């Protein structure tokens, strides 16, 4: 294991920061076309009469479930054809699938294309970015990952508005295809120029560079089970709230205040990433994770207790401050609590479990909202999940709490 002075896993630091830039653009691409744009696809495909809203919601859940299983296929592809080729294939699948969606009329074709897009998402999103950046950085891995994954937040500001504007100007099919093609071309150029394995790190046997060790020996590891549980439960609540934020808050404070709360969540997510990025490598990863989930619970508590717009907006900002950081922190668990050769396998396992759970988050929140008729029950359940995740973060398998 490298010491704190070994900032990089390679003697060429500038190459490491080029990887961070490339990973940032991967995050913009993946979250832009494979996460935030899902709501755009659902809205405009339903509006055009191509598919029903219920069918599109089911296809979205299918997308995330297939994506969870696809993570293992992507790991196998990386071992066989290399990381760059696997990412290029993912770019083609995700961008090509998005461009094809407006041409579809058959439900079978819709689910088939969403399934192919899920493989593209798996090859370009969180697990891939974490493994790529982790192969180049050691002591400052938290900083590098936070900067790279800031692209996920940036995608929410840039890709969706650009896609909506393109659809309004050029029509549904041309608008989506244009945005997808531009994103794919830009990312493809960066991948061709920058993405490669750090050979010096492979020779040294550092964390993240070696091929992923088989996940089999980890299956009964209590640390991995607890880690997957805490992030899976926390992400489930997080995605449930974010997907239903407007339906939950509009009846409580009105459309204008609810929209302001969504904007506060997004802005706080970006700010929270930048603040934590500069200090996360010096902090205890378990305490940071527990504090992040607890902060989200406090934000939900404010939304529950407050009657006017201010508590809802402030609560949404507190919730949002941890949104981005909670997809970075699993990498620090993997680096600090597991052997270097297991880094990639641990990341894949945690993301696959988490994605299976959070795939059902929007549906669960919607059902609770419909059944109860108010935002109180969904918010209480999400708050309880975040507190449970915080408690799990403070517990080390073997009975030792922090």
Language-model regions: role of each:
Residues 18-53, 160, 239-246:
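Extracytoplasmic
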Residues 28, 109-124, 232, 311-324:
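Hydrophobic core of transmembrane alpha-helices in multi-pass small-molecule transporters
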Residues 38-42, 222-278:
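Extracytoplasmic gate region of multi-pass secondary transporters
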Residues 70-82, 273-284, 369:
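Helix-to-loop junctions at the C-terminal end of transmembrane segments
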Residues 92-105, 295-307:
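C-terminal ends and interior cores of transmembrane alpha-helices
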Residues 123-137, 325-338:
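Intracellular juxtamembrane helix-capping segments at the cytosolic ends
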Residues 152-198:
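Helix-loop-helix hairpin linking two adjacent transmembrane segments in secondary transporters
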Residues 265-269, 275, 280-333:
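C-terminal transmembrane helical hairpin of 12-TM major facilitator-type secondary transporters
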